[in-house]
């Protein structure tokens, strides 16, 4: 079954914020973790991920900084901000309410 694009799009910011709540990460790591943790159901390509990260940074949900390591090219690492943490808490609450409603109405199994 393919996952609806709009559902994926609507959850992307929440997924990114949740991963950054754990620790700072760079874009490629974020994309790979989303793919791994979703067992390949959710994938984000650079063409869509990086513009989203830039928009989230402009809205002060996350903060980026360049990190350089000897012998490697520099990478932009992102961290969640206080605003991002508040938004994540609100989104989690909203998703929980939404999922509970789907379970009740459509008879879905919720892990």
Where are the model-predicted features located?
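N-terminal helix-turn-helix DNA-binding core of bacterial DNA-binding proteins
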Residues: 4-48
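Accessory beta->alpha helical hairpin/"wing" motif in late/C-terminal subdomains of nucleic-acid enzymes
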Residues: 80-84
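Intrinsically disordered, low-complexity and often Lys/Arg-enriched segments
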Residues: 1-2, 111
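Beta-hairpin "wing" of winged helix-turn-helix
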Residues: 57-74, 79
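Amphipathic alpha-helical dimerization/coiled-coil segments
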Residues: 85-111
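Basic amphipathic alpha-helical segments that dock to polyanions
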Residues: 49-56
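A cross-family signal for key residues in well-ordered alpha-helices
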Residues: 18, 32, 54, 89, ...
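Short beta-strand/turn micro-motifs at beta-sheet edges
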Residues: 2-6, 66-67
């Amino acid at each position: 079954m393919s996952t609806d694009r709009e559902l994926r799009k609507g959850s992307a910011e929440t997924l990114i914020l949740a991963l950054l709540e754990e620790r700072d990460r760079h874009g490629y790591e974020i994309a790979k973790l989303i793919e791994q943790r979703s067992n390949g159901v959710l994938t984000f390509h650079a063409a869509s991920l990086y513009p989203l990260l830039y928009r989230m940074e402009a809205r002060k949900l996350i903060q980026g900084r360049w990190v350089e390591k000897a012998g490697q090219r520099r990478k932009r690492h992102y961290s969640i901000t206080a605003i991002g943490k508040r938004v994540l808490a609100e989104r989690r609450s909203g998703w929980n309410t939404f999922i509970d409603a789907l379970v009740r109405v459509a008879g879905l199994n919720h892990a």
